Amino acid sequence: MNWFKIKVQQGKDDYTYAGSSSLSLEQLVDEVAQGKFIRLENLVYLDRGEIKDWNTWDTREVPMVYINPEMIIAIQQFKADPRTLPR
């Protein structure tokens, strides 16, 4: 499993999603180039400098998202699961 931060543009605002994918960085970029939606699983978020599981913030939703490739402005890969990396 690989971990990524994906920044998207929605109108004037931008948002960042962080989660895992079975795809490599190269495969992910290729999927975006082909206009395919990107799936991130095991979503996490940053709270006061600490990475936390999505479920601790919102238990109503499945911690997974499909991202429209037309909205993606940046993709960055984590070295490992961000919950295990030192600050």
Language model features with spans:
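Eukaryotic intrinsically disordered, low-complexity regulatory linkers and tails enriched in Ser/Thr/Pro
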Residues: 1-87
